[in-house]
From Swiss-Prot:
EC numbers for this chain: 2.7.7.6
GO BP of this protein: DNA-templated transcription
Catalytic activity field: RNA(n) + a ribonucleoside 5'-triphosphate = RNA(n+1) + diphosphate
CDD domains membership: RNA_pol_B_RPB2
Protein name: DNA-directed RNA polymerase subunit beta
Function: DNA-dependent RNA polymerase catalyzes the transcription of DNA into RNA using the four ribonucleoside triphosphates as substrates.
Residue ranges of the TM segments: none
Length: 1070
């Protein structure tokens, strides 16, 4: 239990705070802990000793800025310097130097690291906490078998098991089990000590026969017996030092190292008082665990819930970085040890600087950030995405679960998740329930547990105090649910509230409550907290909405929502995309690149981001929000980022929608839109694509960048400058050359003319030709060149490879095939774009912008969109914005409906439009068909909804193929858009064509267009020359492949053709 200094009102913590705290903990504590573990290293003769002086290590500020590291594809890291000493023991002389041991990537203001110019983020992992856990399972006879599982800090598991005869076994594998006395004796306890330290010695003596006594007669015998069972070796192994080392390395180190958290858990579960610094499993632990298991057998004690959060721990960024630093120091130790021995062998005088290399630390962190499953490329589709990414919790990764082996129970919601892990926000698909998201108030405690804040209700003190409770503490208190608090604030004694106690939900009197929730959003993640009226939605649809908000594309003209939850400003602020003034002063100059501020007599330049590409090809930019001559204060927002307006998150647009069918164009989640959304650039977004090419040194010489490319048409080279690189500002189309490159190669002898061969023979000249290997713009890449980068890597080789990156901006309007979605899981594909005069229109003549299918609401039970739609219309007419916290029914029944209807009534009176609120069908209105001018038969629900345009766009998905590559084995077209693949006609598609009797089309698809090699060639020739296309006679290649596979199984398969003339069988080879 941790008490917070804040009293009364609570403030929402920074959304990136968990990442920052973890990295600071690594820098302040983790580095020191690992450096203290670095041993003193001696040579074989013990004449020289090398050691590190940890107290004064230094981290140097990076020489480059974050923006330059991204631009030049470098790592934003800090150099680590540690004082080291080399002591010559005979004379006790010491040479001390401050040595450079490597680089550690730093965390930036977004909570991410920049490695090789790429933003990467480290995900928090949930693991089973080390300690002991008791479970009960039924065997095949239906009898309960009690087991105790000891989990080490490494994740290794050992099991204790008690059978029907009350004999206790230690299970070292699935098949092998051994008496509990053997491992206890192998760990150093004799029989007398074992019997003195257990509560039930008679049970231990009951299964101690002569054979067992011989096994534990001495420590050596016990070790041999344990090794024989563990390693499953036959014969009679001989006790030796190497055998002990092998057992120590393979078993005890992996399964008996508890760690700091494991020791604490073991002491609390078994009521032990072993010191915290003793992190290894002791015989006393094993015997106490066996005693507890015997008590379980006879009905004493409680079983453990493995899925309770008190039995889990969070492996944060601090733990992961500390583990990698320790691994790097082990590698450094081996390097130093080898270098010292080499220096002594060659009679050289070593110095601390010569003994240490920076390679182990630098390469360890590079491989960690590049290859580790928990280090991921930061998703920067929009500001919400990059902020939510760092708050993910994963059961996957090293030491964790896999998507295919995790059970339903692990994936399910647990009562201990309340206020810690969001019950809504998780991934869809195979990883559902395995990748979650932190609740907005949750934080990671000192022992790796998730803590959530609550208000303490005390009769002694009238002051409200906020406490952070761990999962192991809050189940002992009555915690009132925050979504259904006091109905009558003045008389708390008369209230009956739902509460949570020991994983059960009860209804109790108010005076029995110990704690209450602090905020209705407390149990949700950021994505779920941005959904208005979430309490009226089905949880599955809320999950879809949380995920789809992260897929929203920043639009060219952002607009904040009319109906929100109040969390939009905090989300935009913590995302880091807005620029905030660090000093107060007067604005003296603004443009798209910078803002110049005059304050305290100094001039400060604030750089802005302009046309920066995210890894999802969206455009990140900043817009100045202050004018020249204005005075600003410290902390004021001076520039908005992409998808923010006025410091609030703005992912979509408020558009006029109607829920009605329209000629079938909005059936099955299709959406009908007005052309106003296209021509008015309502849903226009900018996307930046990156194309790169490298130059290499081949065996025939280096590749050249040039604008003189032979055998290419001039119009393809029109945009190249004199260096052979496309010019800034050029408009490029598909197939244009972006970078001209020639690769040298030797021509074949047969390709030379006879006179060329004669000259070469006389003069001895080696004539080489070059092959054109230019960077060409692929299909769908047309746009404007906005940036070109020529990067040369620094290296020690004689020739350093160069990388040329070309960035092309595309302007994309909304079109048929694009995906749009609301904030309630209501998603759809644009099916038709109607002229605005043909769209249905309101009674004041305003045409509708989008038409949704009304059948998509009842079955999906996401009624929140109806409340948002109607309240948005009222807000648009009244020029008002609403910020509504969820679960407003805790104030009164039907609070949401009353709010919406009252605002519609106000809008109707204020605008003198009675159709806005008609009592017969509130929220609905009579609208007219734009094509005929006639009113529709039924009133239609209309309103303003906040609709997002998602990253799933038709330009990235549509694909066609006329010719392309074929698979080598099956000779069928390749699969996928990236490989210019074809569309597969599968088994069910063939059935459909067979059902319509289209024999010729079916034959074309299975032969000419697929894997009949000869027929493909004949079709090409016939198309060029003219004439009828011959029918394929023999079998296609896939059938021939099947025949060959059957032959490899010794099954001969042939087909025979019977002649029509003489009925003779003509055998043909398949």
């Amino acid at each position: 239990m941790r008490r917070d200094g804040n009293e009364g009102m609570s403030t929402i913590p920074g959304f990136n705070q968990i990442q920052f705290e973890g990295f600071c903990r690594f820098i302040d504590q983790g580095l020191t802990e690992e450096l203290y573990k670095f041993p003193k290293i001696e040579d074989t003769d013990q004449e020289i000793e090398f050691q590190l002086f940890v107290e004064t290590y230094q981290l140097v500020e990076p020489l480059i800025k974050e923006r330059d590291a991204v631009y030049e594809s470098l790592t934003y890291s800090s150099e680590v310097y540690v004082p080291a000493g080399l002591i010559w023991k005979p004379g006790r002389d010491m040479q001390e130097q401050t040595i450079f041991i490597g680089n550690i990537p730093l965390m930036n203001s977004l909570g991410t690291s920049i490695v090789n110019g790429i933003y990467r983020i480290v995900i928090n992992q949930i693991l089973q906490s080390p300690g002991i856990y008791y479970r009960s399972e039924s065997d095949h006879n239906g009898i309960s078998v009690y087991t105790g599982t000891i989990i080490s800090d490494w994740g290794g598991r050992s099991e204790l098991e008690i059978d029907r005869k009350a004999r206790i076994w230690a299970r070292v594998s699935r098949k092998q089990k051994i008496s509990i006395l053997v491992p206890s004796s192998a760990m150093g306890s004799n029989l007398r000590e074992i019997l003195d330290n257990v509560c039930y010695p008679e049970i231990f003596l009951s299964f101690l026969n002569d054979k067992e006594k011989k096994k534990i007669g001495s420590k050596e015998n016990a070790i041999l017996e344990f090794y024989q069972q563990f390693a499953c070796v036959g014969g009679d192994p001989v006790f030796s030092e190497s055998l002990c080392k092998e057992l120590q390395k393979k078993f005890f180190q992996q399964r008996c190292e508890l760690g700091r958290i494991g020791r604490r858990n073991m002491n609390r579960r078994l009521n032990l008082d072993i010191p915290q610094n003793n992190t290894f499993l002791l015989p006393r632990d094993v015997l106490a665990a066996a005693d507890h298991l015997i008590g379980m057998k006879f009905g004493m004690g409680t079983l453990d819930d493995m899925n309770h959060l008190k039995n889990k721990r969070i492996r944060s960024v601090a733990d992961l970085l500390q583990d990698q630093f320790g691994l790097a120091l082990i590698r450094l130790e081996n390097v130093v040890r080898g270098t010292i021995c080499g220096a002594i062998k060659h009679k050289l005088i070593p110095t601390p600087q010569n003994l240490v290399t920076s390679t182990p630390l630098t390469t360890t962190y590079e491989s960690f950030f590049g290859l580790h499953p928990l280090s991921q490329v930061l998703d920067r589709t929009n500001p919400l995405t990059q902020m939510v990414h760092g708050r993910k919790l994963s059961y996957l990764g090293p030491g964790g679960l896999t998507g295919r082996t995790a059970s339903f129970r692990i994936r399910d919601i647990h009562s201990s998740h309340y206020g810690r892990i969001c019950p809504i926000d998780t991934s869809e698909g195979i990883n559902v329930g395995l990748i979650g998201s932190l609740a907005i108030y949750a934080r990671i405690g000192h022992w790796g547990s998730l803590e959530s804040p609550f208000y303490e209700i005390s009769d002694r003190s009238k002051e409200v105090q906020m406490l952070y409770l761990s999962p192991s503490r809050d189940e002992y208190y009555m915690v009132a649910a925050g979504n259904s608090l006091a109905l009558n604030q003045s008389i708390p004694e008369e209230q009956v509230v739902p509460a949570r106690y020991r994983q059960e939900f009860l209804t109790i009197a108010w005076e029995q409550v110990h704690f209450r929730s602090i905020f209705p959003f407390q149990y949700f993640s950021i994505g779920a907290s941005l959904i208005p009226f979430i309490e009226h939605n089905d949880a599955n649809r809320a999950l879809m909405s949380s995920n789809m908000q992260r897929q929203a594309v920043p639009l060219s003209q952002s607009e904040k929502c009319i109906v929100g939850t109040g969390l939009e400003r905090q989300a935009a602020l913590d995302s880091g995309v807005s620029t905030i003034a660090e000093h107060e002063g007067k604005i003296i100059y603004t443009d798209t690149d910078k803002i110049i501020l005059l304050g305290n007599g100094d001039t400060l330049s604030i750089p802005l981001v302009m046309y920066q590409r995210s890894n999802k090809n969206t455009c990140m930019y900043q817009k100045p929000q202050v004018r020249r001559g204005k005075f600003i204060k410290k902390g004021q927002i001076v520039a908005d980022g992409a998808a923010t307006v006025g410091g609030e998150l703005a992912l979509g647009k408020n558009v006029l929608v109607a829920y009605m069918p329209w000629e079938g164009y909005n059936s099955e989640d299709a959406v009908l839109i007005s052309e106003r959304l296209v021509y008015g650039d309502i849903y226009t977004s900018f996307h930046i694509r990156k194309y790169e090419i490298q130059t290499h040194v081949t065996s025939q010489g280096p590749e050249r960048i040039t604008n003189e490319i032979p055998h290419l048409e001039a119009h393809l080279l029109r945009n190249l400058d004199r260096n052979g690189i496309v010019m800034l500002g050029s408009w490029v189309e598909t197939g244009d050359i972006l970078v001209g490159k020639l690769t040298p190669q030797m021509a074949k002898e047969s390709s030379y003319a006879p006179e060329d061969r004669l000259l070469r023979a006389i003069l001895g000249i080696q004539v080489s030709t070059s092959k054109e290997t230019c960077l060409k713009l692929p299909i769908g890449g047309r746009g404007r060149v906005i940036d070109v980068r020529w990067i040369q890597k620094k290296g020690g080789s004689s020739y350093n490879p160069e990388t040329i990156c070309v960035y092309i901006s595309q302007k994309r309007e909304i079109k048929v095939g694009d995906k749009v979605a609301g904030r309630h899981g209501n998603k759809g594909i644009i099916s038709k774009i109607l002229p605005r005069q043909d769209m249905p229109y309101l009674q004041d003549g305003t045409p509708i912008d989008m038409v949704f299918n009304p059948l998509g609401v009842p079955s999906r039970m996401n009624v929140g969109q109806i409340f948002e739609c109607s309240l948005g219309l009222a807000g648009d007419l009244l020029d008002r914005h609403y910020r509504i916290a969820p679960f407003d029914e805790r104030y009164e029944q039907e609070a949401s409906r009353k709010l919406v209807f009252s605002e519609l009534y106000k809008a109707s009176k204020q605008t003198a439009n009675p159709w806005v609120f008609e009592p017969e069908y509130p929220g609905k209105s009579r609208i007219f068909d734009g094509r005929t001018g006639d009113p529709f038969e039924q009133p239609v629900l209309i309103g303003k909804s906040y609709i997002l345009k998602l990253i799933h766009q038709v330009d990235d998905k549509i694909h066609g193929r006329s010719s392309g590559h074929y698979a080598l084995v099956t000779q069928q077209p390749l699969r996928g858009r990236a490989k210019q693949g074809g569309q597969r006609v599968g088994e069910m598609e063939v059935w459909a064509l067979e059902g319509f009797g289209v024999a010729h089309i079916l034959q074309e698809m299975l032969t000419y267009k697929s894997d009949h090699i000869r027929a493909r060639q004949e079709v090409l020739g016939t198309t060029i020359v003219g004439g009828t296309i011959p029918s394929p006679e023999d079998a296609p290649e896939s059938f021939r492949l099947l025949v060959r596979e059957l032959r490899s199984l010794a099954l001969e398969l042939n087909h025979f053709l019977v002649s029509e003339k003489n009925f003779q069988i003509n055998r043909k080879e398949a």
